[in-house]
Amino acid sequence: MKLTSYIRSYECPQETIEGAIELFGMCKDMDFTVPGKVGMGDVDKTIKDSEDVYLESLPMFPLHEFGMDSYVKHIDEACQDYLDSIHLGYYQLRMLGLPQIQHYPPKGGYFQEHIDSYSNSTCNRIIGYITYLNTVDNGGGTHFPHLNHTEQAVAGKTIFFPSGVTHAHKGVVAPDEHKYILVGWFGPSC
């Protein structure tokens, strides 16, 4: 049986790309990055090798100066368009907190196939999104094994997809390049 892909892509404002990478650099300089977490918040570099910034934990930063306010507006509008495109526009979803900035070094990645709504703390994730902040020429994309589909990492591209088992995914390792993304989720508005 062939699964139907519900992956859709949108273009992100250029100011978001530049602002997010600048913000990540500032956070790294100030030791505000954390090792990437998997599962129930564990750090396991054999599964995920990244440095992450949780924008929710930066209340003292003027995020609007880095374009994050326009990004959030863009993502909200794109999510509604996405839901309309898959004939689910009647659902009222909300962004589940601010997105995360994730940096994958060369040979880093989220190596294990996973879904984004797998535990009690993440079961409210209905729609996931990834914005690629830089173009990666060799690897760096997102692979959806059950769909036999890979999204390439192209600066400014945002993809939306269901967070459940039909769209399990994993990172494609970039052997020689860095990869920067913004990730987040939408869930019930109740």
Protein language model annotation of sequence segments:
Residues 99-100, 109, 140-141:
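Conserved active-site beta-strand-loop modules that form the wall/rim of enzyme catalytic pockets
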Residues 2, 93, 119-125, 174-176:
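A generic structural micro-feature
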Residues 101-105, 119-138, 186:
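Short, conserved beta-strand element in jelly-roll/cupin
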Residues 89-105:
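Acidic, glycine-rich loop-and-strand cores that form catalytic or ligand-binding grooves
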Residues 110-118:
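Histidine-centered catalytic micro-motifs
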